[in-house]
Amino acid sequence: MTDSKSAAPTTLYDKIWNDHLVHEADDGTCLLYIDRHLVHEVTSPQAFEGLRTAGRKVHAPEKTLAVVDHNVPTTDRSKPNPDPESADQIAALAENAREFGVTYYNEFDKRQGVVHVIGPEQGFTLPGTTIVCGDSHTSTHGAFGALAHGIGTSEVEHVLATQTLIQKKAKNMRVTVDGALPDGVTAKDIILAIIGEIGTAGGTGYVLEYAGSAIRALSMEGRMTVCNMSIEGGARAGLIAPDEKAYAYLKGRPMAPTGANWDAAMRYWETLRSDEGAHFDHELRLDAAALPPIVTWGTSPEDVISILGSVPNPADIADEAKRLSKERALAYMGLTAGTKITDIKIDRAFIGSCTNGRIEDLRAAAKVAEGKTVNGNVNAIIVPGSGLVKEQAEAEGLDKIFIAAGFEWREPGCSMCLAMNPDKLAPDERCASTSNRNFEGRQGFKGRTHLVSPAMAAAAAIAGHFVDIRDWR
């Protein structure tokens, strides 16, 4: 544990890194101890097969949690999975978890859900821990002050076998967001604004620490949304120092410490903040009060614009490579420069994902949907982030609000965030989505994705086009 009294001022990232450093070679290559390993069906089959071939066991099965999420249908699960490859991956994870003694939530377990929803929900995610998963949005767990990031399949095998990971240390960037968010502006708008400011490569080589009064004011769900999309800004991970909100969220969770162990953990957790005077390699500041509801218009998360804006003209971009890229984006999205964002009609709406599939997100969407009706030209689906989120939403009657308004109420899973299950866009369909990526084909071949907050997605589903949620009645 870092002795902050005698050491030079240290960042939160540096503290967690130093507490988990096993060995550092002369070239800066490090061996890092991993506290928690989350596993899903897509990036794990080859890793488990590698263990089997080498005759190895999972080093720490008690520190490994597996769940099926990417490929599961969100409709009737009593029927066979329509995609044979997906069915094989799901079956493989069940068998691998059984063989290697790993805790596993299958598609019929109410604890099942998107991997980055269930980790915090179960108390598997804890402040000051190192967390990895074969999934790029592992940065979500940084909302609790955990150093969390995605890894590749070969690294999944390495962590399963050794509970360590070979890494090189990143640089520190602090993003400070101060001020009060205006009504209708959310955590999703904060992170989209940050990505719009730094670009999708601006965080490359960095771990981002989010700070400031606007970040502190966010709920844990909101903080998870911000940290979730750190990777879209190019960063390795995102962090928020834990506080009373984080502790209250975790206390009593099934896998969280209890009794004297909780007290001991709290003593450590309360040291997890960047010291006054700690060095950051880069600093960025945003004024929360100046942020509008944001919509992406192109095929990169950095293509952000205010709901009151218009589609930009690539001809105004001096850099030729960037201009050509944005011209391609406009053509793919089927948009014309100068079109008002509020004039863009949609065909589909998706509310869910590891970015915005938690209870707070569903409450925000239900508040918009109550007493309204989904536009006749729009298909809209609500996909809870986990079985427990679904259970809570139904206890609050949110499902009835959505169904009465014409939304489809689904089972938990990654769903339309990515085209790896039955929920996907048809060519040229346009979607208001609460997910994290708007790349070409992300939600389906030739599908067109606009990233927005849950309230904005619900409003667009009802209006049939994007609207300013601040004016919603």
UniProtKB/Swiss-Prot annotation:
Pathway: Amino-acid biosynthesis; L-leucine biosynthesis; L-leucine from 3-methyl-2-oxobutanoate: step 2/4. GO terms for molecular function: 3-isopropylmalate dehydratase activity; 4 iron, 4 sulfur cluster binding; metal ion binding. One of its GO terms (biological process) is L-leucine biosynthetic process. Its cofactor is [4Fe-4S] cluster. CDD domains: IPMI. Binds 1 [4Fe-4S] cluster per subunit. [4Fe-4S] cluster binds at residues 354, 414, 417. Its EC number is 4.2.1.33. InterPro entries: 3-IsopropMal_deHydase_lsu (IPR004430), Acnase/IPM_dHydase_lsu_aba_1/3 (IPR015931), Acoase/IPM_deHydtase_lsu_aba (IPR001030), Aconitase_4Fe-4S_BS (IPR018136), Aconitase_4Fe-4S_dom (IPR036008), IPM_dehydratase_rel_enz (IPR050067), IPMI_cat (IPR033941). Keywords: 4Fe-4S, Amino-acid biosynthesis, Branched-chain amino acid biosynthesis, Iron, Iron-sulfur, Leucine biosynthesis, Lyase, Metal-binding. The keyword Mitochondrion does not apply. Catalyzes the isomerization between 2-isopropylmalate and 3-isopropylmalate, via the formation of 2-isopropylmaleate. Belongs to the aconitase/IPM isomerase family. LeuC type 1 subfamily. HAMAP family: LeuC_type1. Heterodimer of LeuC and LeuD. This is 3-isopropylmalate dehydratase large subunit.
